[in-house]
């Protein structure tokens, strides 16, 4: 449906983003089929932002590092995607991060070593997770660390969960009152979006 809707517009007038979400079927064949189907369904010859989805995740059989290896390295899919970027079929290649800090650090170490250049990284960031994500859930990593590591390398950040699943748009009444006192014309949600957008290097 997205491809049909966008067909009426010039391709240069918008950006497309999609992902390699091969969590359950990560053979080379299944993964390349997923990539090719994205091009077909979006009715395009190239994708502006392509992500390796859920780096840092795990499943019942694999620890995070093992799953990353199985989904993207052992099956040659990362090399396949790098070649697609070289051909111009992918304009920007990155990953979305969920979970284990060691996996995040490992992915950036590949960038540091010249094995892969990440054009962008998608991280969870909002004014609560900036300093308290790990405190709330030990499995999470504070956004200040994630963003800081990307900034050190000049890698742009794409933000997910700027409203923390909508919770930052539904604050307690005393907090809302203070925000409205400061800027009556702004919505509660706008404070969260402004927070993320005010950081350097956020796409």
List where the protein language model places each region.
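N-terminal binding-site loop/beta-alpha segment at the start of enzyme catalytic domains
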Residues: 1-14, 45, 80-86
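Aromatic/hydrophobic pocket-lining residues that form the small-molecule binding cavity
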Residues: 2, 31, 35, 74-77, ...
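Active-site phosphate/pyrophosphate- and oxyanion-stabilizing loops and adjacent acidic/basic residues
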Residues: 3-4, 36, 105, 194
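A short, structured active-site edge motif that brings together acidic residues
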Residues: 12-24, 50-53, 123-125
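Beta/alpha (TIM)-barrel catalytic core signal, keyed to glycine-rich beta->alpha loops juxtaposed to Asp/Glu
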Residues: 55-203
């Amino acid at each position: 449906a997205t491809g049909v809707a966008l067909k009426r517009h010039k391709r240069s007038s918008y950006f497309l983003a999609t992902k390699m979400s091969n969590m359950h079927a990560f053979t080379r064949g299944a993964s390349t089929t997923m990539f090719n189907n994205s091009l077909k369904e979006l009715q395009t010859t190239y994708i502006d932002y392509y992500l390796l989805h859920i780096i840092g995740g795990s499943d019942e059989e694999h620890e995070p590092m093992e799953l990353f290896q199985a989904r993207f390295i052992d099956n040659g899919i990362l090399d396949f995607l790098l070649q697609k970027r070289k051909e111009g079929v992918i304009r920007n290649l990155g990953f979305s991060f969920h979970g284990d800090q060691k996996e995040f650090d490992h992915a950036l170490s590949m960038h540091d070593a010249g094995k892969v250049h990440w054009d962008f990284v998608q991280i969870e960031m909002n004014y609560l997770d900036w300093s308290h994500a790990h405190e709330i859930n030990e499995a999470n990593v504070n956004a200040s660390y994630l963003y800081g590591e990307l900034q050190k390398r000049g890698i742009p950040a794409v933000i997910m969960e700027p409203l923390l699943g909508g919770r930052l748009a539904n604050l307690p009444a005393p907090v809302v009152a203070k925000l409205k006192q400061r800027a009556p014309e702004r919505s509660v949600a706008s404070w969260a979006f402004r927070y993320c957008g005010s950081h350097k290097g956020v796409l």
